Design a protein with these regions (language model features):
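SH3/SH3-like beta-barrel fold
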Residues: 130, 229, 242-246, 254-255
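Glycan-recognition patch characteristic of GH18 chitinases/ENGases
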Residues: 266-378
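Glycan-binding loop/region signatures in secreted carbohydrate-active enzymes
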Residues: 273-274, 498-590, 622
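N-terminal Lys/Arg-rich, disordered targeting/topogenic segments
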Residues: 1-43
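Conserved, mostly hydrophobic/aromatic
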Residues: 316, 393, 413, 450, ...
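Primary recognition of N-terminal secretory signal peptides and signal-anchoring hydrophobic helices
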Residues: 2-4, 38-238, 268-278, 282
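Short, acidic/polar
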Residues: 295-310, 367-385, 432-440, 582-595
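Substrate-binding surface in catalytic domains of secreted glycosidases
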Residues: 326-329, 333, 377, 400-546
Length: 624
């Protein structure tokens, strides 16, 4: 038989195995707990590093930059040898020509000087001219002298001007002599500072040594070092830093704590020379001027009627002088007895000089020095012979290329008038971009009165019918002129007339029946019209003429608030007629607007086109 299993024996074996295994389980070592990292020490080191970094950064921020800006960076130049140019407090773009030194004398190209420093110099193709209140000085290129209007010669140790590489260049010493534009040279910074602003400005002395920097903040580059007591001009004040200009013209920022007491002070002229004074003649009362337009005679026969009607007028301006030819000769319709009668009536007489002769060339007349001299001499002699009180210059036909020559003529004429104690007034269009070349700012510096013609808003041979002088146009004309000219020198010119406009349907230019018409293609609706294509013409109408038209056609009037005038229209023979009425109502609003700017006067074009009621309105604003 085979072996049999013994359950009892088997149980004992299993029990024994179990007992043998249990001590192993009991004696097995428990795993060691993991050691905890020392987080406290590591965190402390990390925080310490951050603190050190912050402290270092703070220290860095507190350490002023010692880096100095290069002259190339400061002036935006590429050439290390080129000198930068500062005019008053502005860095100048010298693309028109940089300053340079020649035989120990500093020069500037004429274009750089003219557009950035002084446009009072004028080159006529033969000589460089400069006109002060009483004289015109002339320097020929390459010569070492200049002459005045009386022919007196002044010798210099340098050439006031000469040509270099085809460009006219002006000595800065001559600029200083003529224009009172002084200069300093900083060889360290390679800069030239030209200054001619003698107005009061905030200035102060520095309390400590310091640095002027390119921007506010000590980390910005240094422009220049400054010492205790140095005087600076404060250009802009900030909370902690201010923008200042140093005594060498450099501009930078310094901390406010370095500035002493700031006072408004004018810079003294370095060599003590008195600044030139452009004295002017001003009436003790508001100017109330009337233009008396004449064509073939003096107008003496009309003077009694004018005087009886124009109660309140104190200046009469007869249109007697016209430029006759390019050489500067004039046509003169004046009569001494006219002046005598006007004076007896308490009126000053300012004779008009105009350029209505279309055969003359403005560039020939005003651009040639000998022609200007002839014209000025002729006008001054004629005014003195007549016993008149002044000149009213009315030049309306020149183009922009004549602008500088015309301004030079005004300078020279003003000097001649100043010597003879004659009033000089100059008529101007309402300021617009295309008439900027009339340079009202320069006019305002040298003449007695600048007249703005606040009329011809819509004009002969213009493309659109409209008011001769809307209320808004009067305000705009006065505001823009006073922005360029001291208000006490401004005379606001107003119209005594309107225009009757005629619009006739047409297809082309060939439909014109006379030269007074202009063909207008208004297909795009740009203008206020009844027709897409039309011929437009107009004629000047007096206040009495307006009334006749209104009565003849039995017209009703509509008041236009935005224009400040009555308006009417009618159709006749296929044409559309329109009229913006000038009367005592529109004049009242215009006078109120003009006088609100406190100008030196008002003027009216033209006498004999007004009614008596108009002068009552005028006196309401001028008799104060």
């Amino acid at each position: 038989m085979g072996d049999e299993k013994n359950p009892e024996k088997d149980f004992e074996k299993e029990k024994k195995k179990k007992i043998e295994k249990e001590p192993e389980k009991q004696t097995k070592k428990a795993p060691k707990p993991k050691k905890k990292k020392k987080k406290g020490k590591a965190g402390f080191l990390f925080i310490l590093l951050i603190l050190l970094a912050v402290i270092c950064a703070g220290v860095y921020l507190l350490i002023p930059s010692k880096n100095r800006v290069s002259h190339n960076q400061y002036f935006g130049l590429e050439d290390d040898n080129q000198y930068g140019l500062i005019v008053n407090s502005e860095i100048v773009d010298i693309t028109n020509g940089a300053p340079f030194e020649e035989n120990g004398v500093w020069y500037l190209p004429f274009s750089t000087l003219y557009y950035n420093i002084s446009d009072a110099f004028y080159y006529d193709g033969l000589a460089l001219l400069y006109t002060d209140p009483l004289q015109t000085y002339s320097a020929a290129p390459g010569e070492s002298f200049y002459t005045d209007s009386d022919g007196i010669k002044y010798t210099l140790t340098y050439q006031p001007c000469y040509f270099k590489d085809g460009s006219l260049c002006i000595a800065l010493d001559y600029l200083k002599l003529m224009d009172y534009s002084y200069y300093t040279v900083d060889d360290t910074m390679k800069s030239i500072w030209v200054f001619n602003d003698w107005s009061k400005q905030p200035r102060t002395s520095l309390l400590k040594d310091t640095k002027a920097r390119t921007q506010a903040g000590i980390k910005n580059d240094i422009v220049t070092s400054l010492a205790t007591g140095d005087v600076v001009t404060v250009l802009e004040q900030g909370e902690s830093w201010s923008r200042v200009q140093t005594q060498t013209g450099l501009v930078g920022y310094v901390q406010n704590k370095m500035l002493g007491e700031i006072k408004e002070e004018a810079k003294a002229v370095p060599d003590g020379r008195p600044l030139p004074k452009y004295t002017n003649i001003a009436m003790d009362e508001m100017v109330v001027m009337g233009w008396h337009q004449v064509f073939s005679e003096s107008g003496y026969s009309q003077l009694d009627d004018i005087i009886s009607t124009a109660k309140g007028m104190n200046v009469i301006c007869p249109t007697w002088f016209t430029i006759k030819d390019n050489d500067g000769n004039i046509q003169n319709l004046g009569e001494k007895k006219y002046v005598t009668k006007a004076h007896k009536a308490g009126l000053q007489v300012w004779v008009m000089l105009d350029d209505i002769n279309i055969s003359t060339d403005g560039l020939q007349v005003f651009g040639t020095t000998s022609h200007r001299k002839t014209l000025i001499a002729a006008v001054i002699d004629a005014v003195k012979e007549l016993g008149a009180d002044g000149i009213n210059l009315d030049v309306e036909t020149i183009k922009s290329d004549v602008g500088p020559s015309y301004i030079q003529f005004i300078r020279e004429l003003s000097a001649a008038c100043r010597k003879e104690k004659l009033v000089l007034s100059v008529d101007n269009y309402s300021p617009m971009p295309h008439t900027a070349f009339y340079d009202r700012t320069q006019q305002g510096q040298v003449v007695d009165y600048v007249v703005v013609m606040a009329y011809d808003e819509h004009y002969v041979k213009g493309p659109e019918a409209g008011s001769t002088s809307s209320l808004a146009f009067v305000k705009q004309s006065a505001e823009r002129t006073i922005a360029e000219v001291p208000k006490e020198k401004v005379i606001v010119g107003l119209p005594f007339y309107s225009r009757l406009w005629c619009e006739t349907p047409a297809e082309s230019e060939s439909d014109k029946t006379d030269n007074s018409q202009v063909f207008v293609d208004n297909s795009d609706g740009t203008y206020d019209s009844k027709n897409n294509k039309y011929l437009l013409s107009s004629k000047g109408v007096s206040m009495e003429g307006e009334n006749n038209i209104i009565r003849e056609h039995d017209l009703s009037l509509t008041w236009l608030d935005d224009v400040g005038q009555f308006y009417t229209e009618y159709e006749e023979n296929g044409s559309w007629y329109r009229l913006w009425v000038e009367d005592e109502n529109s004049m009242d609003l215009k006078m109120q607007a003009a006088c609100s700017y406190e100008p030196g006067g008002v003027a009216f074009f033209k006498l004999n086109m007004e009614n008596k009621e108009t002068w009552s309105i005028i006196r309401k604003y001028t008799d104060k």
